[in-house]
Amino acid sequence: MTLDVSKVQTPMRIDRYLTQQVENMTRNKVQAAIEEGRVLVNGKPVKSNYRVKSCDHIHLTFLRPPAPELAPEDIPITILYEDDDLMVIDKEAGMVVHPAFGNWTGTLANAILHHLGKDADELDKTEMRPGIVHRLDKDTSGLIIIAKNPTALHKLARQFANRQVEKVYKAIVWGVPKAESGTIKTNIGRSHKNRKVMANFPYEGAEGKHAITDYQVVEDLGYFSLMDVTLHTGRTHQIRVHLQHLGHSILGDETYGGATPRTLPFSKSEPFTRNLLELMSRQALHAQTLRFRQPTTGEPLSFSAPLPEDMELVLEKIRTVMTASQS
């Protein structure tokens, strides 16, 4: 892993800096890596008390245990559609899509292998992503396409790359945008302050990758909004980062500013928002609609998944309290 230290970074011990910047990294792990010569700054080994400076170039070599073999697991999944080439699954919040460091079991990939049985032998399991065409964040619910053979995987991946797949999400956000609809265009890349999260950069700049998101307010809830959000690109955390950039973070999004209780201009609003966040213990984001073409026949396919129970409950609470506060 390489990290380029921000121009505005204040001096900080390298063990502390890497603990902040690298996911699942502890100070003990950093110090062990430094002692073993696996941390280089500007091409040279350093000690734990080295103070990181602006524009330093850090290279960190990980020593990770070999990944276990991907195994089928009997995990219930909701399949909305299945044919010889693909499945469309309504993923529940809290499920990781594929195994990775820290999450080797209990993933959607494990469930897919169990469901397909011997048919899964056609799929490449070496990268722990059998049939997975695209991803959803762990705590985002909703629709995901799974290819059942290499040809379908290739053709579906090409549809995504050519932006021929329509993806529409439902999001509950804090506040009501001034414009009922709009397009957000920025570059998205790793944050300079914390490499574990993504950040917005100028669209015409050199940093990050182009990201384009459309939004449409479908219900004005007074101090909240229910939105349709359409992705034109597929960057990591794109919707969450873009809605924070708009000034309307997704309710419950701990990483991007949506999980702190707020005081609103009506009586007992803070206990109310605190209760909402207890009910919505994740980002209120649901991949509701997918439109694409069947990879063999070219037939247009369209799918929609109902809002999950937690989002429906939160919407009901908001509507009830907003109606009472305005009466």
Swiss-Prot record:
Gene Ontology molecular function: any one: RNA binding
S-S bonds: none
Signal peptide range in chain numbering: none
Record-linked PROSITE patterns: PSI_RLU, S4
Record's keyword terms, sorted: Isomerase, RNA-binding
Active site (record annotation): D137
Enzyme nomenclature, EC number: 5.4.99.-
InterPro entries in the record: PsdUridine_synth_cat_dom_sf, PsdUridine_synth_RluA-like_CS, PsdUridine_synth_RluC/D, PsdUridine_synth_RsuA/RluA, RluA_PseudoU_synthase, S4_RNA-bd, S4_RNA-bd_sf
Gene Ontology biological-process entries: enzyme-directed rRNA pseudouridine synthesis
Enzyme class of the recorded protein, top EC level: isomerase
Tree of life domain: Bacteria
Family to which this protein belongs: Belongs to the pseudouridine synthase RluA family.
NCBIfam families: rluA_subfam
Protein name: Uncharacterized RNA pseudouridine synthase Cpar_0723
Native source species: Chlorobaculum parvum (strain DSM 263 / NCIMB 8327) (Chlorobium vibrioforme subsp. thiosulfatophilum)
